[in-house]
């Protein structure tokens, strides 16, 4: 009985020591895979479109993503006088293709999801995109 218990304890100890290392390498290869997929998309460049707005005809938007993880976001409220805004900051990927754009001067954050190499879509911080009839109006297309 004592021998069976001893063998079981040894087996658990050996197996327990080996698992975290394998789990860590699986996480690293998953991150590497995501990075390679993003590189293959060639998502750097300028994306343009007109986003919906409640108080004007729309917001003409241009988002430029640079390969040094910086961005420029230009927003023009159509039909409004003196309503052009430009923000600059850095972006990083939160989960797969979800980008968080951070503006250092105001601590504001916005989120875009890369759909493919030619389109990004305005999103929330969880990566949820509009699926309704207005979904196409939240897409910016690469110039």
Which stretches of residues belong to each language-model region?
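Phosphoinositide-dependent membrane-docking surfaces
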Residues: 91
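Short, conserved beta-turn/loop elements at beta-strand boundaries and strand-helix junctions
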Residues: 94-98
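Lipid interaction determinants
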Residues: 17-86, 100-143
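Sec-dependent signal peptide recognition
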Residues: 2-8
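Absolute protein N-terminus
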Residues: 1-2, 143
